[in-house]
Amino acid sequence: MKVPFSWLKEFVDIDVTAQELEEKLFSCGFEVEELIPLDAGISKVVVGKIVEMEKQEGTHLTKCVVDCGDYGHDIRISTGAANMKLGDCVPAALDGSTLPGGIKIKARKMQGVESNGMLCSGEELGLNDDLFPGSEVYGLLILPEDSVPGTDIAPVVGLDDYIFDISITANRPDCQSVLGIAREVAAILGKPLHMPAMDYKAVCEPDAPITVQVEAPDLCPRYMAHYVRNIRMGESPRWMKRHLALCGLRSISNVVDITNHTLLEMGQPMHAFDLNKVAGRTIDVRRAHEGEKIVTLDEKEFTLNPNNLVICDAEKPVALAGIMGGANSGMDENTTSLLFECATFARDCVRKTSRALGQNSDSSARYEKGVDRNSPELGLARALHLIQELDCGDITTLEYDLTDGRPLERKHIVTTPAKICGVLGITVPEQTMIDILQRLEFTVDVQADGSWDVSAPLYREDVESFPDLAEEVIREYGYDHINPTFLNTASVTNGGLNYAQKQQLKTKRLLAAQGFYEASTLAFYSNAELDMLHIPAEDAARKAIRILNPISENLSIMRTLLTPSMLNVIVDNLKKGNAEGRLFEMAPVYLAKELPISEHPHERQTLCIGAFGPEEDFFTVKGAMEALAAGFDLTFTYERETTPWLHPGISAAVYCNGKRLGVFGKLSNEINGELEIAKDQKDSQNIYLGELDYEALMSCVDGELRYKPLSPYAAIKRDLALVCEEKVTCGEIEDTIKKASSLITEVKLFDIYRGANLGEGKKSMAFSLTLSDPSAEISAEQVERTVKKVLGNLKFKLGIEIR
């Protein structure tokens, strides 16, 4: 949120610099993302008074002699502008000056005449008419007659200001306004807060009745409206235009500007309905009907449902509650009567409607964080005061204030100074705590027994209990008063990565070496993702923990598998034109012992890998598995297993030391056909997935490092091309080969071939064998005997022939 320094000064007598205030705000829990000086990029630009002018013959230029005070009383500068006259004061960028955008001004010749700088327009200084009148004229910016030559230009044109870009956290909706930040600044500096004027007087009766009703008080706890007649559209005063411009808004008209100004200043969204366009002069706050439509002020049409709250007239919706008004009831140059609305809408309703429709606004941003029920009264009063002050219309006596019946009461918290200090872990003087709370507009009633009855301001809905009071105290008292200490239960460590973290890092590096990139997904999805994988209802993966307040229905359960998230990432990549890739994710899944949960679920660390692309195959994923096995000095075995989402003939379960680690294989043809991707992608894509229980994998790893010397003798490799039945698995062949001799240290599959020349139901698999002996050099005879034994075992056990 952008907050001008000059606007804050209207509410608080600030006696520190903007930079000092930035530090104080940060120390009190407000993150100033950026402190923006308005004169950024401007240097050595001063007020210059034109004392001589002469047209330069044969050119469009005018030679000027400019009085720049202490910088020189007769500086010669040529300009192409024609809107100035003798005696005018204008911005003069002198030799060596800079302008916004990194523009550097140097003395140079223009059409053969020396020019020692540049006379500037408002645009060249980054100004517009809302910031300084006359800035958008074609030509030079003409300054006030009483401007003093040689004065720095910034204070003359209002560029001696700063914008605080503050990140407002979700628990402080009361700070979503200039007044809200000013309130905090007043407390920080120990200064009084000067509230904006909110007095007004009704001057006439309504010319006709208006009906206002709220059918959904659960979604609209308070709805206020006031009727104003004889609307007089016009231009806003300079101060209001400047306020809006500093916050990034352009002035439109006096009445529209008042609604925007109230939003920025008070944090209260408001809307004005043109009563001449409101059918039946009726306003009804209700849930939308199924299929009802509205066109908003930005000319977008939306189809609504009962989950959306709308403001309606006697015939149709005229506004999306808390988000944006309808185009059918907006102000224009013919508007003569307005109904001003200020309300409190349920934050969840506004958030869900905004997300569902993809429609956001400054109003919805504030309602989503929360607007307290007292805010509409203050916001409406401020707006009506401005209506009267700027003579925009005649305020009538007709006003509505509809509530859900709940009383507007301050929250009371009974506590003791000892409790607050106990939370902080330090002793803060009682009177200091009382002073801090009172500066923050809390009231503290000290009881006879020494306890405190503290009442929170109406706008502080985030304050619920005494730890919240402790937070308020320490924010103002200073976190630097808390001495760093160890927890009683804490153990001292040497720092750095622990064993588990090192193993995770090693795993990631092993996969990265195989060409895999790390993915990171949300910890929740929906049952639709499990449906997509054809997971049966009785499967343990269906025993998912439901979120009570999901961000959306698509994110309504805690994940029990990583594979659905990985498949979503792959599909998103394919939709965006990424035709190939290798990904992995290491993250927990959440497994409940029973539902509904009665204890914390087990967060089981899991590893998921995915590969997609026309050239990817089964052995891409198997190669990743083997890389993990080799990296951790393990031996994996593979067995056939049916998995709902994997191809029955191109998948396997992974085992280590008798433990089942997980599964991997090709996505089933049926699921591949159901993916929301183009048909040509479905036909050409190969998608392979694998998911391992990472905790089970790590339980197989021997954490003790042992020295294993390299053999001083050369290893020997032999390749075997074997023909076997389709039903014979790669794992069976590898296992048989390894058991033939202790000299065989490694077996790798490097090719699979199927063809008519092999015969029906046959395939060829080519393996590379590595033979090594750490104690002696292997002879050719040993190699031949070993290979012969391998082939004999393969033929006897599996019926395999050499090709």
Task: Write out the residue ranges for each language-model feature.
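Mobile "lid/hinge" segments at catalytic clefts and subdomain interfaces of large enzymes
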Residues: 114-130, 135-140, 154, 162, ...
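Conserved mixed alpha/beta core segments that line enzyme active sites in large multi-domain catalysts
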Residues: 33, 47-78, 246, 259-328
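A carboxyl-terminal module marker
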Residues: 2, 20, 438-442, 462, ...
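Extended, well-folded interaction surfaces typified by the phenylalanyl-tRNA synthetase beta subunit core
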Residues: 413-579, 718, 770-774, 782-803
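Beta-rich nucleic-acid/ligand-interaction surfaces
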Residues: 39-43, 200-202, 455, 491-492, ...
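Glycine/proline-enriched, intrinsically flexible loops and inter-domain linkers
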Residues: 5, 23, 53-55, 189, ...
